[in-house]
Each structure stands twice: as C-alpha cells, then as structure tokens.
C-alpha cells in the first residue's frame, strides 16, 4: 500500500526488436537495451540516388524463398541501422548505469541465471535483400557482467542459401540459450545433416551444453532423429527435449538425463491430432527466477496442462504424467458451462491450482481451486 513507482533512469529503451530489459536473478539490477544517446533524426531519402542497387552472384546454386518487406536499397539499410542500433546498459536499483559492450544491432542481451554473464547476439553486415533479418550474420558471444568479452560462441554467417523446406536450418551451431536449472551453462543445437531435410540420415540434430567459463569442449546431450524444436529444463537429472518433422506433421518428446546423457522417447504423435494432444508440461520458478519443470513430490511426475479438444469443444485439463511408468492420470478437467484454464500450480503437494474461468454470463476471473476436494475460492 505504501509502495510507489519511481523513474529508474531516463535513457529510453529500444523496444523495436527483442526483449528490451532483463532482471538479474538477485533483483538488484537490470540489463537493458537503450536507444543510443544523440542518435539524431532519422536519415532522409535523398532525391539523388547514390548508385544502382548491386547484388553479387558468387556462382553458387541456391534455391531462394519469396519473402515480403525485405530491405531493398541503401536507404532501407540506413533506416534499419538507425532504428535497430542500441546500447546494452546495466542499471541498479539506485539508477546508476554502466554501458556493456559496444553499440550495435542487438538481437539478444540475456543475463545468465546466476547473473554473472550475458549472452549477447549482435546482427552485423553484410545485410541481405533476399532474406529477413533473422538470416543476417549474427555474432554470438558471452560477456561478463562488466561487459568484458569472455568467449565467442560463433559468428553465424549470412544465410541466403539454406535448402528449401520447412525443416531446413543453417549448418553449424544455432539456437543458443542458457540452461534454466544451472547458474551459467550454455546449450545449443547443431544439425547433423548439414541443415538439409532431404539428406537421408539417422539423426537430424544434436544438442550440446557448455559450462562456464566456456573454454572447455562442449558436451553432447542428445541426438534427435527429427528437427529440434525446444527444450524444457527440470534439474540435473530431468529435461524434456522436443523435435518435429513438418512434412509428416510428427512431433516427439525425449526424456533426457543431463547428468548421465541417457535419453528415452516418451511421446511420439501427430501434432495435428488435437484430441490426442497430451498438453504442455507446467513450470515453476527456481532460485534464479527461471521457469523449470514443476515436479510432484515423487520428483519424477510432471503436470501436463492442455486445451482438451473434444467433440463438445475445448475442455482444458491437468494431468499427472509419471516419467518412469509413462502412466497418465487426469486430476482435473473443466466442466460446462465454464471455460476454465489452469494458469499455474501453487502447491503441487496439496494440488492447489490458479485457474482463469469465464462463461457466457461471467467475465474472466481468477480462482484458487483445490484438485483434491474441488473447492474454489
């Protein structure tokens, strides 16, 4: 009741692309992305062209997709750099600021869970008139919280010649991120088929991890026979890795033990079959404030929340899925006349769930529901 908002610092955030700020896990400061001071007015289109639009053909055959709203000339490039350029700034709760690294087209500036490092992704030239910005060159590096370079993970080159296909990806390491369950461990994915889904091979992708201080060899975590599509970290013994293949509408989920590198496929289905959708694992925040798998008291059962498609319409549900036995128990499902979804589980032991409920006659509201006795408050 006595709290009030205050202005922390006056530098405007650059919110045009990506996440503009991240809280550190100790809640003592933020890593922000700000507009560069003194950047001036936007560039103006000259009435005199500087010259023709030039594109190089280096003699390589490459299939090219058709995209909308690409860069088309040097003026587009100037506008792109003007609006996208940013400065990473650390700010504490007293408003004291410190610049981190150099200004650039910052794609990502995510601190590690323990707050000691920053995963920095910077888009750089040469730009392309053939592909969107996520195919532009990207320098991926780790800085310490003071802004000092620690390790360069990869300088991803311009990707104009990726094979045609929904499951085609760039070759080499990609999809870098922090392990949510550890203080400072990077994970990334690398294609085993050169990124070409038409190549016949047993495995498509491999996931690796790299521990701080990042000067050791990466450790392989799991090989996937389909294209990597995501990972949810639990703890040192549990992670769920997802893969999919667009051409056959297939998705798989693997139970992986990050400690001993064992892996077991636990879900294999068509992602277009909504009736058989097992839902998504529910998460909880760990000591770093990062989402990790929410486990029941036995430490090997996860809670799954889904839309619950049925002939009567969507009836959202919560299931318990035992990762050892693979047995599923439905512990709650919405009932007409309400549409009610599980937002989070407050207490996995007492099974107290926060839900959002609405109907034709009631506006959406939030409730605490006991899944043991059915009481709602």
Briefly describe each language-model feature range.
Residues 1-375:
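Beta-propeller folds
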